[in-house]
Amino acid sequence: MAQISLTFPDGSTREFDAGVTAGDVAASISTSLRKKAISATVGGAHYDLAWPIHADATIAIHTMQDEEQANELVRHDLAHIMARAVQEIWPETKVTIGPVIKDGWYYDFDRAEAFSPEDLGLIEKKMKEIINKRDPVRTEVWDRARAIAHYEANDEPYKVELINAIPGDEPLRMYWHGDWQDLCRGPHLQHTGQVPGDAFKLMSIAGAYWRGDSDRAMLQRIYGVAFTGKEKLKAHLTMLEEAAKRDHRKLGREMDLFHMQEEAPGQVFWHPNGWSIYTTLQDYMRRKQRAAGYQEVNTPQVVDRKLWEASGHWDKYQEHMFIVEVDEDHAREKAVNALKPMNCPCHVQIFNQGLKSYRDLPLRMAEFGSCNRYEPSGALHGIMRVRGFTQDDGHTFCREDQIEAECAAFITYLSSVYQDLGFEKFEIMFATRPEKRVGSEESWDHVEAALENAIKATGHPYTLDEGEGAFYGPKLDFKLTDAIGREWQCGTFQVDPNLPERLDATYIGQDGAKHRPYMLHRACLGSFERFIGILIENSAGKLPFWLAPRQVVVASIISDADDYVLEVVEKLQAAGVRAEADVRNEKINYKVREHSVGKVPVILAVGAREVEEKTVTLRRLGEKKTSVETLDAVTQALGREATPPDLL
């Protein structure tokens, strides 16, 4: 029999018969490893233990201690177990797809009656029964005709449609546990009993169109979460409870920041308090960008399709664009325009005005670019997923030898912004060359080395995301971690030689000839709308004092203090503090509760004693203790707190 060579993570190699399974390989190492093994990564792909290996490859055996692979298997198996449970309870239900998603899975069902929240408990109970049966998981490869005949006979039209969409040369794998069977690529555990029965929970029911097409059947989607142990599930559910308390939509109402309405889906109606946050943040970013050497520009909202065709967006991005047809002076054909979904092609137009020399590079442009992108209504989410948004967009035109310095400077800039906004920790994901790419290997080598050297120069840890770069260049993604451990991808840095070529951007080099510049796309916040949502949730509404829309409320205890309240407010405002008076005929405890719900950072109470002594009683949000301060001292202290960090 033919032999194959398998290379293990420690670099050692061993010979095996071709067709050996990952389970056999684990058993050859030790009996204990075979008992603990759940799957294997072979040649970079994840397989179950029954998968035969026919060629030389790298191999890593996984156990439940390998969290990434274990979570994938547990969640994948639970998707199948849930579908089986549903069909055992309601046999007439038709199954469709059930992928693994972040923290869990979902499965879409076609059922005449709607699932109720009470049904989730029934399904969970049945799932635990299936887990306790410890049914072996087995797999077979079927030909297309047999698979279609099977699903047609069982009245599963969605599976037939899925099979017809699979390329003809791709094998069709069928997985069973018990008598229940599903079409699936795998991998899966060896029996249902390997799934932790106390570490999953069904979460919610939603509607979903088949294939995401509103003209197709409306299905019912059941979501679940799962982990490798009950303590991890408990921690996740606690985090979800905390996230619900921090939901920016809830806090947005309580703080009177914004609202959304059906007449303008995905567009934000900013109220004065919310707009104060927005403009304060924008002013801060404007100063930071200027200090980093960027020139601010502004480009049109409505742009003719010709530019989008030239840039390539018309072909690749049109479904996300808002198209505007204009009857130009009763011309034979209407002019076709689009609301810009991004700013980069317009920035190239500015670069192309006038001759550019190598001495002009790097040339840095920044724009608070207002963009519009179509998102399905079901994907919209408060101010975090919208159709109209503003980016802190920037583009640098430079030579190849300038990329490293520009990248390092941006990482330093981004780090200082995140720190000022209360995010001490972020992760850099370095996406490298994909399999399908343009450009020479030498150019890719140089550019990837430039980005890696830049990251190392700044001292930030990073993770390689191999093969996930764009077809024309590598990129960096920056992920923030918030106060409850959630990750948010906000910042980006993308190397792009493609768009300057498509839009014919050139500069005159030292040799007197024309050369193409590299275009570096970068954003720090991403969009103001989404980032403000993240800020609200990260801080639970207790924004940094300098960003808070209502920084201080001065509240009267007695009506005789009203004039002094106004005097205090005037003095604070003169010191740059956003201060308001509350002289309503209400009890002070009522005023404190109301303004605390509105997340006002500081409340100054003023009564007869404060009027006489020219003092205030200071209470900070979330604290029970108060302190009596002189008006001059509190004005000076709060004036400093109200100053943006870049101006201190």
Curated annotation (Swiss-Prot):
The keyword Zinc-finger is annotated on this UniProt entry: no
Assigned keywords, A-Z: Aminoacyl-tRNA synthetase, ATP-binding, Cytoplasm, Ligase, Metal-binding, Nucleotide-binding, Protein biosynthesis, RNA-binding, tRNA-binding, Zinc
The organism's place on the tree of life at top rank: Bacteria
Main location: cytoplasm
Co-factor remark: Binds 1 zinc ion per subunit.
Similarity field: Belongs to the class-II aminoacyl-tRNA synthetase family.
Subunit (UniProt): Homodimer.
Role according to the record: Catalyzes the attachment of threonine to tRNA(Thr) in a two-step reaction: L-threonine is first activated by ATP to form Thr-AMP and then transferred to the acceptor end of tRNA(Thr). Also edits incorrectly charged L-seryl-tRNA(Thr).
Record protein name field: Threonine--tRNA ligase
Gene symbol of the encoding locus: thrS
